[in-house]
Amino acid sequence: MIKRIPILFFIFLIFYYFFKNEVFEEKTIVVGASLPKTGIIKSWGESVNSGANSYFNYVNDNNILNDKKIRFITYDDKYEPEMTIDNLNRLIFTDKVYALFGFVGTPTVKSILPILEDLEIPFFAPFTGASFLRNGNNSNFINFRSSYKEEIEKLVYYLHDKKGKNKIAVFYQNDDYGEEGYISLLQA
């Protein structure tokens, strides 16, 4: 599945060009991300950065986009929402990215949601299962992972119906990420 995400990304870009009736003349497609390269979940940011760069380099080295190159720009947000907002503004207004890809974290993505809703920039494969990305009617948001609610419903079903457990203890992170999981568990 992981190998298919970058392929789907490029299919999405092609369809986006087609349906927007735009001719993309630029030789470089600039894609950007704000990632936790340092801080408490730096390993997640490093994984997204490493995986995306590996595939984008493969695409560029093998001329898969017919003489167009992908430039992947990333900035460290340390999993801090305020830094994510600053990074997003830099990516959009300074770097002039065509698409946003692989942002990591529920609190960080939630902080940029009002900005994203006003723009027509594709926001592709954020690494969060938050419901706020699924509740709106924004055609520029493309999710590839399950929602936290779907994951928790499956876990509760398994524990209750398959394992016969009637009590579940809950420990959750005290932020938007943890709260969403906790509420999803109560609803399941």
Residue ranges and their predicted role:
Residues 1-3:
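N-terminal hydrophobic targeting signals that begin at the initiator methionine
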Residues 19-33, 63-69, 160-166:
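Immediate post-signal peptide segment of exported/extracytoplasmic ligand-binding proteins
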Residues 44-50, 64-132:
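Beta-alpha junction/loop-to-helix N-cap segments that form part of ligand/metal-binding clefts
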